[in-house]
Amino acid sequence: MDDGLVSWLVTISIGGVALIMRLWNLSYPSKLLFDETYYPKDAWTMLHQGYEGTWGDAKTINPQIAAGTSNGWTPDAEFVVHPPLGKELISIGEHLFGMTSFGWRFSSALFGTLMIVLTIRLARRLSR
């Protein structure tokens, strides 16, 4: 078998296992954890308003989001301390799967897997 074909089969196999491991039980726990209290909400408002909007008090809004309610934002702009790329990537998952724990974690799992695949291919290229 051709060495190039084998290397791609190994890369795809490792990438597939990595993706399955990342997606397995991704939605647990279903509540907002640590920085998730900021980024998924900012991504959701960017998806719907085009900019980061403000939300109500996290102690009342976060349980509502975990329960499936995603309309607690206001039209007021949020104070932004980070560039928008990460929130734009999170909004892809939210667009596909809704404002759910799986939705706001999906992009991180997908791009984390792509980094593994790219690292394998880069190592292969550099070590030939």
Where are each of the predicted segments found?
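Membrane-integral, polyisoprenol-dependent glycosyltransferases
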Residues: 1-128
